[in-house]
């Protein structure tokens, strides 16, 4: 029988409601861990709940669950107010990736792109992002766009990067939009603002930055803290786009 930690309902209302409305014995260890991770994402996770979820994932991993391998890695990678541990995250991602989990391969791409407990290795990052992109992961696809935009591992080609960002929007699904559209619109906004890979167009930049702000706001409000800087950039980008637009407004005497 699973022994669930007791939390303050005022601090963790979603977790409390989930536990009151469900019999946790009806859930597998992986299912229960996934449900608990999705609760109260806007507040730091309680340490006792973090430890409980880790144990649930470890139980599932012992049974060969590759999704638990990846999700435990994500729990260590993300900063939910407990133990952010890139070493453990990479270990879990590698374990899942070797067993064919494409999301883990994408996550490893991030680790090598940013040097999370491994040396920055753009060749490996490109390799893992390519695997994700071939499997339809739009995050992997726009990260490949970033590599062309910056000349990481591949020859710098802003035009190719811009086309990749456009391709992301062309193939965007309703399911992917809440977590992908914001970052892609931000990149398109910057491309239009500075004429990187396309003609400079302040009006198109403003539209993209506005759309980016809406999606990124929802991401941050849903607990995706790492996108707070992107949200700030989208707001700042609007100001820069408006400044350029105002330069072209004729003076009226």
Predicted regions and their residues:
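Helix-turn-helix repeat elements of alpha-solenoid scaffolds
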Residues: 7-9, 44-51, 85-86, 121-122, ...
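TPR/TPR-like alpha-solenoid repeats
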Residues: 35, 75, 111, 132, ...
């Amino acid at each position: 029988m699973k022994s669930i930690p007791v939390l303050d309902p005022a601090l963790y209302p979603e977790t409390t409601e989930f536990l009151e409305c469900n019999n946790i014995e009806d859930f597998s260890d992986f299912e229960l861990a996934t449900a608990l991770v999705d609760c109260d994402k806007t507040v730091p996770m309680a340490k006792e709940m973090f430890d409980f979820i880790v144990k649930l994932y470890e139980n599932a991993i012992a049974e060969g669950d590759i999704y638990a391998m990846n999700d435990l890695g994500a729990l260590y990678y993300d900063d939910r107010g407990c133990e952010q541990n890139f070493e453990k995250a990479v270990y879990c991602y590698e374990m899942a990736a070797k067993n064919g989990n494409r999301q883990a391969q994408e996550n490893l791409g991030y680790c090598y792109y940013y040097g999370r407990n491994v040396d920055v290795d753009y060749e490996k990052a490109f390799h893992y992002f390519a695997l994700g992109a071939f499997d339809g992961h739009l995050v992997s696809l726009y990260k490949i766009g970033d590599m062309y935009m910056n000349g990481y591992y591949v020859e710098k080609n802003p035009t190719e990067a811009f086309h990749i960002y456009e391709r992301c929007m062309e193939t965007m699904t309703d399911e992917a939009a809440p977590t992908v559209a914001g970052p892609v619109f931000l990149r398109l906004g910057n491309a239009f603002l500075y004429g990187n890979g396309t003609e400079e167009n302040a009006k198109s930049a403003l539209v993209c930055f506005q759309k980016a702000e809406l999606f990124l706001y929802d991401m941050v409000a849903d607990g995706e803290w790492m996108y707070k800087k992107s949200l700030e950039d989208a707001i700042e980008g609007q100001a820069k786009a408006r400044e350029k637009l105002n330069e072209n407004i004729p003076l009226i005497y």
